[in-house]
């Protein structure tokens, strides 16, 4: 009976161990921000979301609705892709801060599997007062 209990415990622990379904990175500062995205699983697709936070009272926040960003993807083989996206800056607010979170890309299946580098650069044309940094959330889906 003791052996059966040990086997059941071992199988339970074995099944409980799995790779994380995603990862998040938040980088402080005004940019550019460099993230790593592990896309080594060739059977999965990936969802990417950006999030940010501004700490400033409403009167001191710039009336900017969105932040233009250049997003550069660098493959494991050093090939690059680049695009301009606009991150909305108002979703959840309190008196002293506001947070934004937006789905950037859904169901990404890269041609080259491995660890990608994503460099995000804000445009100089927009100044966002109280910007704390930028975060990238990567969710793996099977």
Tell me what each language-model feature is.
Residues 126-137:
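Edge beta-strands of jelly-roll/beta-sandwich modules across compartments, strongly enriched
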Residues 60-69:
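Short coil-to-beta strand junction motifs in C2/discoidin
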Residues 14-16:
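C-terminal motif of bacterial Sec signal peptides marking the signal peptidase cleavage site
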Residues 26-47:
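Post-signal peptide N-terminal segment of mature Sec-exported envelope proteins
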Residues 50-61:
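Short amphipathic, basic-aromatic surface patches that mediate peripheral association
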Residues 41-50, 108-128:
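Noncatalytic modules at the cell exterior or secretory-pathway interfaces
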Residues 83-111:
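An anionic, turn-rich surface loop/hairpin at beta-sheet edges
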Residues 18-21:
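Bacterial signal peptide processing site
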């Amino acid at each position: 009976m003791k052996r059966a209990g040990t086997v059941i415990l071992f199988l339970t622990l074995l099944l409980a161990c799995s790779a994380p379904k995603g990862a998040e990175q938040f980088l402080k500062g005004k940019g550019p921000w460099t993230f790593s995205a592990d896309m080594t699983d060739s059977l999965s697709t990936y969802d990417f979301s950006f999030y940010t936070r501004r700490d400033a009272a409403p009167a001191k926040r710039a009336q900017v609705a969105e932040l233009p960003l250049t997003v550069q993807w660098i493959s494991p083989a050093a090939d690059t892709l680049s695009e301009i996206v606009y991150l909305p800056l108002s979703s959840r607010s309190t008196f002293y801060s506001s947070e934004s979170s937006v789905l950037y890309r859904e169901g990404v299946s890269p041609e080259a599997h491995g660890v990608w580098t994503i460099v995000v650069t804000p445009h100089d044309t927009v100044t966002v007062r109280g910007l704390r940094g930028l975060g990238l959330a990567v969710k793996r889906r099977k």
